[in-house]
Amino acid sequence: MIQMQTNLDVADNSGARRVQCIKVLGGSKRKYASVGDVIVVSVKEAIPRGRVKKGDVRKAVVVRTAKEVRREDGTAIRFDRNAAVILNNNNEPMGTRIFGPVVRELRAKNFMKIISLAPEVL
């Protein structure tokens, strides 16, 4: 469950290390984002010579949350930390690699590129 001011890890090699959610997209009064939702983030920490710089405002998709995600079959999955993948203007990942596992729910939201790049899909 991601809301404004939430800090997230970045799970790709776009150059950002930490980002902060500044808006949850999908309605004017929407408060929370879960796995597969697109948010607007500000880059708080970045590596030198990366594709994004500190202070950049970008779109990102949430790939892992500490709040559990309920599934149709009754199971739930949760992670230790919140993580996101930075997106470009075409809603494709900016990086060429994804670090760590991602959840199956991204497939239903048409983030196939992230699914194919991820080392593990849970």
Swiss-Prot record:
PROSITE patterns on file: RIBOSOMAL_L14
Q: Name one GO cellular component term.
A: cytosolic large ribosomal subunit
Please give the start and end residues of each transmembrane region.
Answer: none
Family membership: Belongs to the universal ribosomal protein uL14 family.
Q: What is the recorded function of this protein according to its Swiss-Prot or TrEMBL entry?
A: Binds to 23S rRNA. Forms part of two intersubunit bridges in the 70S ribosome.
Q: Which terms are listed as keywords in the entry?
A: Ribonucleoprotein, Ribosomal protein, RNA-binding, rRNA-binding
**Gene name per UniProt:** rplN
Name of a matching Pfam family: Ribosomal_L14
User: How would you summarize the oligomeric state and partners of this protein?
Assistant: Part of the 50S ribosomal subunit. Forms a cluster with proteins L3 and L19. In the 70S ribosome, L14 and L19 interact and together make contacts with the 16S rRNA in bridges B5 and B8.
Q: Which organism is it from?
A: Jannaschia sp. (strain CCS1)
InterPro entries given in the database record: Ribosomal_uL14 (IPR000218), Ribosomal_uL14_bac-type (IPR005745), Ribosomal_uL14_CS (IPR019972), Ribosomal_uL14_sf (IPR036853)
Its recorded name reads: Large ribosomal subunit protein uL14
Task: Report any one BP term from Gene Ontology.
Answer: translation
Question: A Gene Ontology molecular-function term?
Answer: structural constituent of ribosome
